[in-house]
């Protein structure tokens, strides 16, 4: 197929009477590369006997364009469904420059989650690794365990409970400044700024308008290019993303230096945020994280802590507007909690534990529109799975799209039904919005806290209606309504 496409390009070029020199050079290079990689791909396919069925697609880019295209059309399942129907629940493809085996079943999820550091290790595409460098998402083995232990000390429930009142206070202030008194708002941009400000405050006490605005401008460029084909040429989205990441690191570096001075002078507390915690604590060997490690991990948590939560909160507002009976039940639960508080008293950790129905509503939103679509592993040795050979060094991909909306695991999968999560909930390894196993998202409790506190405050103040009930949700790289979810606010009397 590749060779035919190259010939087609050549035939079209011959229709030009005097093709420009640069075009001729580019065309010759393209045909040469296409033919070279066609030969390599053909040779490898013959050499890798017993691998799962599938196709590698185009040279270099593989099937990445179709993979991303399905997401941006709002149909991420299409990429996987078309291939599982043809090849089964384990198939071969090529994504972001890597031969990849995709696992599309609860059994596949369980296998990958339970074989971390045995047969597989966490391994995002190099395009992602180049952005997050020495962060938890890119490290493996002992380095990953060390980072996870340190970060989880801050993100565990026992530590987060101290921040509930702080998050509640910030949420009330955000609603007072941007929602209350408005007839209509654009939900997604407001929620992005809300979750970003929250993450900046809790992770690094970045809360002045100038610092937030400067970081925000770089971050909006950064988030658009995380899952992109890594074409690092001037003007490409990926190139802009790398420059934005460097600018964010530079700003974080200045903040780290200032915080070190403040800690030494006693003008900052070791418990005030993640940054102080990382600067004040050491690992089992008595070593502190380097400044680069701190920058990379705060960058990762700022990305994960704001973009995923704003996506979930936005689709949550959409689903509650579409399902008024669910809204009424959430409102009833939250008013009961509010009624148990003194005037002006902030929420506490114990209040979040009482928000059982509200969390089931959030879980159902995460089932239908999970913020993270899946992740990657790498085979550290050749092994057999389901009768197929998985070569050493290949990427492996698990995806929520293989289980979250499948009728085999969820009856009426398109229906919004929080009751699915009553009792024992869904079958094991079918509901995996935070992943699983040793690499399970360390921020899942942080996300839960953030979602429930916002939900408590928004339903206490408003009901709302969708301006465009038919607004489509796309995935780029996380679920987002195409027009930003404009809603009409209806304040409670």
Curated annotation (Swiss-Prot):
Native source species: Picea sitchensis
UniProt key word Kinase: no
MF GO annotations: heme binding; iron ion binding; monooxygenase activity; oxidoreductase activity, acting on paired donors, with incorporation or reduction of molecular oxygen
Pfam families (UniProt xref): p450
Cofactor(s), by name: heme
Protein name: Cytochrome P450 716B1
Record-listed E.C. numbers: 1.14.-.-
PROSITE patterns linked to this entry: CYTOCHROME_P450 (PS00086)
Family per record: Belongs to the cytochrome P450 family.
Main localization, broad class: membrane
Segments crossing the lipid bilayer: 20-40
GO cellular component assignments: membrane
Gene: CYP716B1
PANTHER family according to UniProt: CYTOCHROME P450 26 (PTHR24286), P450, PUTATIVE (EUROFUNG)-RELATED (PTHR24286:SF384)
Keywords on record: Heme, Iron, Membrane, Metal-binding, Monooxygenase, Oxidoreductase, Transmembrane, Transmembrane helix
Superkingdom: Eukaryota
